[in-house]
Amino acid sequence: MKRFLVTLSLAFACMAQAEDSAGRLARILAEKGILTNDELANIERAGADEAVRLLSSALYQKGILTQSEMARVYGPAAGAPGDVRFAPGVATTYVPAAAVATAVVPTVPASPPQTATSPSARTTQIQELTTASHFPMQIYGTVLWNSFYNTGGSNIEDIPLVASKRGSDPYSNFGMTVRQSRFGLRYQGGPEVWGAKLSGNVELDLLGGAAPLANGVGMDLVRLRLAYGRMDWKNTSIEAGQDWTVFSPLNPISLASFAIPAMSTSGNPWIRSPQFRFEWHSDATQAARVLLQMAALDPNVGDNPTTVVDARTPGIGERGRGPAVESRLAVTGKIGERDATVGLSGHYGRGDNVGVLNGVTVARPVDSWGVNLDYTLAVSKYFTLAGEAFSGRGLGLFSVASGQSVLAVGTPGEHGVLASGGWAQAQFNLNRKWQMNLAYGLESDEGSNLITGSRGKNQTYMTNLMYKVSPHFTWAWEWRRLMTNYQNQQSLNAIIQTANMAIAYVF
């Protein structure tokens, strides 16, 4: 009976004309303990069509809906192009990590194509996918094609983040790639353990490098993004595995920077790292919802060799003989009927920078620390403002002062390079199909910690336009202006422009 009533309610939500029907239903289910705060927050941030999809997915994962019942809710017109909305722009660790940094990827797999005249259009039974241990499982992914044009040299041709020194590579370049595509497995809904609901995620992309062959550019290697398991009680959760960090959880919206978050090295600290995490959140019915997260992480400070290696060797962070620690406190309230979230997070790790001075091996202490403020303000259904501001030292793991976050023993940056910055993005939902984003990011490294030739400042201006043809097909265009300054080498400061066109197929 419970399953029937929820299915009937979802069908009503799909037919209702009011934009917040699914949101109201989600709040009722949260009050009854069927939905978690995380799931409710994700649904409330979505538009009408996407909210129904997220709600259906959550109920399917909990075993309340079967896939055949989901098909009855959606009907043959589930992906009708006239009823498409973008999910709001910036994902945080407050929502399931599989959705992080991808505001255009729905969380419900597409139903098989059906024609209106097909005799099975209303009665098709969809076989559920399960693991060997009988966990319900979803396969998801995004096949992403990018074409790009750069007016000058950069650190990464297809995902440029930093402009090369003036004169080092003055030639423009063009190319295409699919290596930002990603694929994953998500499981949730099996038997409870100690009263907790189990879930997990494994996600891969193709940014692990290119094959060492003359024609190996298109033979991209697999890279691990996510691999974690969770246990969720009513108000608390624990997680172990590789996931997005608690520190600095937001990312700008971009299909040009899908594998490496936009504004990386321009004010956006980010990383996915092995960790053990604890979370507590207040009840969804409270006017102001509170989320507290604490985590112990792998102590890496971002000094891993850039060449391919077969074994891990101790680095600066590992020599600190203990984990790094992080925490984040976030409060979510309302602006009218929409969520507004402000969070404050911190990171600390201890390490030893080992080097040779005058023929003697010495160690210099490195305190890797950071403080970050994040905000997501959904002012209206047409406009959302989001961003971050940070300050810290030795944050190379987060692509802050990347490649120069801790310099060699005997140099000014031997204890770690101090850096600060931030980014902001204005998201405009023009209608159900079109979305435009304007963003700016800045990272400034402390000059007294640097050596000549290091990057002193990096700025990025970005705008993109996205056309969501359907929930499973998006077309996007993006332009960026990169401005990179080099320490004590002003004549080598560089500016490049980059343009990108992307086509995303979501399944």
Question: What is each of the regions a protein language model found here?
Answer:
Residues 1-4:
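Positively charged n-region of N-terminal signal peptides that target proteins for export
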Residues 152-158, 211-220, 250-257, 302-317, ...:
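Outer-membrane beta-barrel translocator domains and adjoining extracellular loop/strand segments
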Residues 199-208, 296-298, 344-350, 435-448, ...:
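Transmembrane beta-strand segments that form the barrel wall of outer-membrane beta-barrel proteins
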Residues 124-302, 321-336, 376-380, 386-387, ...:
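Outer membrane beta-barrel
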Residues 9-17:
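Hydrophobic h-region of N-terminal signal peptides that target proteins for export
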Residues 320-322, 327, 332-455, 459:
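Detector for outer-membrane/organellar transmembrane beta-barrel domains
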